[in-house]
């Protein structure tokens, strides 16, 4: 994963260390939610001053909120427009409040990202659409999409890859050229029908 140095520097300008800034960038782009356990995993730190100081800094500056997570700890939501604005992604839905199932899915998704940092991820909807339509020549008609109806005065909006699950380049076997890989993240509460509807989206769009 290649994190843009300019964006990391801008997050550092808000008072964060380099490792904190890199972690916050990953959270902002891919999840919006995280636990201090995930922060400790990313930074290689133990329980104690470092994660506590990081959490206090986030809350004091109003960059995140915290809530109880299934009575097993706390879950943090990085919501501040200031942070997202520093990386030119203040329109991401990760900033918004979501259901518990959504948060759980995003935590599982972040676990995957942190465990596979060597992969080349497509960060945004536009990155994904551009890769398929411009580099691979795939018509947008065949991309997974959802139509959002507007008001009587506005046109419907078509959004692509709305699940925002990780999409990345990876080699199927050692030494082979990388291929684009789509993923599905199960929060643990989904029904089989949800996976089926997800898996057939590309064919039905």
Give the residues covered by each predicted segment.
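Nucleic-acid nuclease catalytic cores
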Residues: 205
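Basic, Lys/Arg-rich alpha-helical nucleic-acid-recognition elements, primarily the DNA-binding modules
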Residues: 1-86
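Detector for Asparagine
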Residues: 2, 91-94, 116
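Short, amphipathic alpha-helical interaction segments positioned at domain boundaries
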Residues: 80-107
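Exposed, interaction-prone assembly regions rather than primary DNA-binding/catalytic cores
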Residues: 99-194
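Glycine-rich, often proline-containing surface loops adjacent to acidic residues and nearby aromatics
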Residues: 33-35, 86-94, 175-183
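Conserved Walker B catalytic segment
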Residues: 196-201
